[in-house]
Regions:
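TPR alpha-solenoid repeat register
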Residues: 37-38, 71, 105, 139, ...
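Residue-level recognition of tetratricopeptide repeat
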Residues: 34-35, 68, 102, 136, ...
Length: 422
């Protein structure tokens, strides 16, 4: 069988995913074909994700050429993919410093250490490679990627910008898009937006549109964010993250109807995202739909019983509607699930008080006091409750705190003085 026929047959087996046939063909291929054809097959296996087969081919080639550094590097990469890091490191460390492939080995080592979270060691390896090949763009790109991952955004941006002056893409990465991502990660949103818009001139992709919209939103350019997100929806209706940001953008322009419509559209696409239900609840309130707001907030809490923001929003609605039994039902359900959050104590205290369960009300007013000493509205309710219950010494303490945070309110000073004279 000719080389072309053998490779064609192997490609057909790969496309069919016929492992038994691949194994059968591979044995013959290794025995009959030339080394360069065998190496080409290893590359094909790696491209298709057949790492075990690629390792088998490279191991065979290593047997034939035990001192070939490139084979050691290639096999080390495959072994890392297979989770066999120890053998991969052994191969890489065998490569001599005088070898032309040594800088490449250093980069692979840096990638490994980077994956392990050993960033300082990874940077040392890249710097060593740069000391050998200071003008190699791919090494500068590798360092920029490492700096980006470790949060050194300005240093990374400088390297990416220098590289972008040479060419627009490295290792399949669009440098305009990467620069946008770096500046966005570093909260330089206006600069990020400029790069996203430049990247969109080269290619319109969902991730770039979303990045542009997010950066525009953070730059308070809400109309631009809306424009990008509406285009994103057209391009990819299942880009779930777009709907919340679109709704938030409409809300920032005070178009609450469109914000509500956008978030409901998002819920049709993704009915398991608690953040969508929370925002739907908020927008329902803004549109004067309290029953719908309660429904969406309850959905959010059902998805995550400890979703604090949704719980607080829901209990606030119930309290405003003076549905004190519902407040207590929600609060006690959370307690039964071992969810304790002091922000809910004032609601519980007020609800128990209104239901004339005064001992429970006192318990939660007392528990809430430490966290709400600077909240005048809470302290006012608490002091009146204490006075009603005849707890005058405690009322004096709370009045003293009210005077401290509202020194201009004579009412509290007068009440304190009247208690002093009783």
């Amino acid at each position: 069988m000719t080389v072309n026929n053998a490779m064609t047959e192997m490609m057909q087996a790969l496309e069919q995913g016929d492992l038994a046939l691949i194994d059968q063909l591979l044995e013959s291929f290794l025995m009959k074909e030339l080394p360069e054809e065998i190496y080409a097959l290893a590359e094909v296996f790696m491209q298709y994700g057949y790492m075990k087969e690629a390792d088998r081919v490279l191991e065979h080639l290593q047997f034939l050429f035990p001192d070939e550094a490139q084979l050691k590097i290639d096999r080390a990469n495959v072994l890392m993919e297979l989770g066999n890091e120890d053998d991969a490191l052994d191969l890489l460390l065998e490569i001599e410093e005088t070898s032309p492939e040594y800088p490449q080995a250093l980069v692979v080592l840096a990638d490994y250490y980077q994956m392990q979270g050993l960033y300082e060691v990874a940077e040392k390896r890249i710097n060593e490679a740069l000391s050998i090949l200071p003008d190699e763009p791919l090494l500068h790109f590798a360092k920029a990627e490492l700096l980006f991952e470790t949060g050194r955004f300005l240093e990374a941006a400088r390297l990416y910008e220098e590289l972008s002056e040479q060419q627009g893409e490295f290792a399949g990465v669009n440098l305009l898009e990467r620069l946008a991502e770096v500046y966005r990660a570093g909260a330089a949103y206006e600069t990020a937006l400029d790069y996203y818009l430049a990247a969109l001139e080269d290619e319109v992709k969902p991730d770039i549109l979303f990045g542009a919209a997010y950066s525009a939103f953070q730059s308070q350019k809400y109309e631009m964010a809306i424009k990008q997100l509406e285009e994103l929806k057209e391009l990819d209706p299942d880009y779930f993250s777009a709907y919340l940001l679109l709704a938030e953008s409409y809300a920032m322009t005070e178009d609450n109807k469109k914000a509500y419509s956008a978030i409901l559209e998002g819920l049709k696409r993704d009915e398991y995202d608690k953040t969508l239900y929370l925002f739907a609840g908020k927008m329902a309130l803004k549109n004067g739909l309290p029953a719908e707001a309660e429904q969406y907030l309850r959905e959010a809490v059902a998805l995550d019983p400890e979703y604090m923001e949704a719980v607080l929003a829901l209990i606030s609605i119930l309290a405003q509607q003076e549905r004190f039994e519902d407040v207590i039902e929600l609060f006690e359900t959370l307690q039964q699930n071992d969810f304790e959050w002091s922000a809910l104590y004032p609601f519980a205290a007020e609800a128990y008080e209104n239901l004339e369960l005064y001992d429970r009300a006192y318990e939660f007013y007392s528990l809430a006091y430490n966290d709400f000493k600077e909240d005048a509205a809470f302290l006012e309710k608490y002091v009146y409750f204490l006075l009603e219950e005849g707890k005058r010494s405690e009322a004096k303490e709370v009045l003293g705190q009210l005077i401290a945070i509202q020194p201009g309110e004579t009412e509290w000073q007068e009440k304190l003085e009247s208690l002093e004279f009783e």
